[in-house]
Amino acid sequence: MPYYCGVDIGASAAKLVIVDADARMVAKAVRRSGVDYAATAEACLAEALAAAGLARDEIAASLSTGYGRDNVPWADGRMTEIACHGRGAWHHFRRAMTVIDIGAQDSKVMHLDDAGRRTRFKMNRKCAAGTGAFIEEIAYRLDLPLGDLNGLAERSTKDVTLGSFCTVFAATEILARIRAGEAAEDIVKGAFRSVVKRIFEMDTVDGALVMTGGVVAYNPFLVTLVEESFGAQVLVPPDPQHVGAFGAALLARERAQQGEEPC
């Protein structure tokens, strides 16, 4: 049986997925991207192959995506993050939808029709507001491990509104709030609300709302806040961090099965 590989080299994390001929995920891997994307992609591939008990020559086709997609020498082709995240999300929820992906360095809002075709998209790449980098800055300013933020936000009992989306200005405001005696959990929840507000200002929502990305995977309370703002349930794939890599693997499979050349 042939297998297909998708690798998503993000600014912070590299994700890799292997699927079989029936589009079932058989293995995955995730690592910090580091500075040598090629080496990181190679390590992810080796890890996933070992987990699936596969040999390298059993991978019939592969596609790379993400910030470092041009730095994966063994990939047969490259696809945009928009295409791969959209394809991965639509595999899980086959309906018209708006996909919000919150990454380390950018946020994306994608609109798909009920056939999975992309109708429009918007990206936030010029500012850290509404991204994982903003949340990392909050953790740094509060001197907290990044992994503690979600639990803190869940324990908040008071609404605190940060007045700025800008990471630099927000950091200054956080220091002022700490001096004023605001609780860390209330500040973190306020920061999460700031991310949510920024995302909804990027574009409108059409159809079902789906959220993907590592920020969502590690901070599920963000989804709760989005649901409060959206007024309806938010759909989250089983493994939101790997949706881009999964979509790349699915596209590699489809192109190979249709006899198309890698792009």
What do the predicted segments below correspond to?
Residues 1-81, 225-228, 233-234, 260-263:
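N-terminal glycine/serine-rich phosphate-binding loop of ATP-dependent small-molecule kinases
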Residues 8-12, 67, 102-106, 214-218:
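A short acidic Gly-Thr/Ser loop motif
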Residues 32-33, 77-86, 100-104, 122-130, ...:
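Active-site nucleophile and cofactor-binding loops and adjacent substrate-binding regions
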Residues 67, 200-201, 206-229, 240-244:
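Glycine-rich phosphate-binding loops at beta-strand->alpha-helix junctions
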Residues 67-120, 200, 247-257:
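Conserved phosphate-binding catalytic cores of ATP/NTP-utilizing and phosphoryl-transfer enzymes
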Residues 115-158, 163, 250:
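Glycine-rich phosphate-binding loop plus the immediately following alpha-helix
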Residues 135, 237-263:
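Glycine-rich phosphate-binding/hydrolytic loop that grips phosphoryl groups
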Residues 167-204, 241:
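Adenine-nucleotide phosphate-binding core of ATP-dependent small-molecule kinases
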